[in-house]
Amino acid sequence: MNKNICIVAGARPNFIKVAPVIRAIVNAQKNGQSINYSLVYAGCEDDPTLEDSLFDDLEISRPDIYLGVDCENLNELTGQVMSKFELYLQQNPTDVVIVVDDLASTMAAAIVTKKQGILLAHIAAGTRSFDITMPKEINRLVIDGLSDILFTAGISNNSIANKEGAELSKVYMVGNVLIDNIRFLQQRMKRPQLMDDKQLKEGRYIVLTLNRKAIINNSEEMRSLVSAVVSSAHEAGVPVVAPLRGKARQEVEAMGLEGIMLIEAQGYLDFSYLTAHAMGIVTDSGNVAEEATFNGVPCITLNSYTEHIETVKIGTNVLVGEDADRLVLMTKVLLRGEWKKAGIPDRWDGRSADRIVQILVNE
């Protein structure tokens, strides 16, 4: 009997994490296993963040279904996703729903799945900030609490998942699916034309990314942080390359700083090459920090916590919060080449998705 799996993505970063699972399902099909999948996106078909190159780079097809939800209010978004995803499940026989990470749309899909009596699996389970005032922390608690199967990326996540949900859920430490992509795409990565255009040399620039609304919406704080890293790097003659979008780009552009190169948002392969060959990275993205650990690139995270503490305990990541003085201090350590010794966490081996699919096939 065919096993029908529905994979839900709520935003662009989710596709990067589910892509290895989709490729593993396709390989399982080629090997004669009875397994089908559909990819459902909570957003709209014309979402500008879902450029064709993203799917080409990841070697997956675009979503089969778009729920078409597009709103800023998280409660409204949750309600719309629940309503539309429920209709989808009623019309499409599904054995397992896979959700990833901790978005409001992810939580909405998880709730509907359980109400329909369908098996629910959560990738990147057991991640916690331990700050219940954060909407995403509430999402994580709800999703993990409802899930039948919890797929964790590391030992600390596994410990949390076992402690909180072992009686109701099956917990599997499968490793980090994000790393599957890097290993899969390594041979296809090539030096982007942008680096020639900007005369950038491998190992002689810092990449800066900003995506967290908490930072971007606080103009004074964002300017302070950007100024801290750019001025420190400029003193050392090292350019800061910043692929920024929207409000963040406008704010930084208005600062008129020397030593920063504002560039367009890059495709996944080009961005991966850019970060893998940087002297260091300053980011507020957990995904970027995880990839930096795998690539052995020093990383400064503009946050006081990380969902994957292995990137700090074992990897190249250092947390500075939103503290501009500490950011200056760590940027100078980076520029002096005095970064801490680091390694790669257990099971970040590029085979996480294969483990996930085989577990689901056997359920």
Where are these regions (language model features)?
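Short internal beta-strands
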Residues: Y37-C44, P239-R245
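A nucleotide-sugar donor-handling region in carbohydrate enzymes
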Residues: C44-T49, G68, L146-E220, V320
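Donor-nucleotide binding loops and adjacent catalytic segments primarily
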Residues: D52-L54, K190-H277
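Leloir-type glycosyltransferase catalytic cores
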Residues: S156, V318-E363
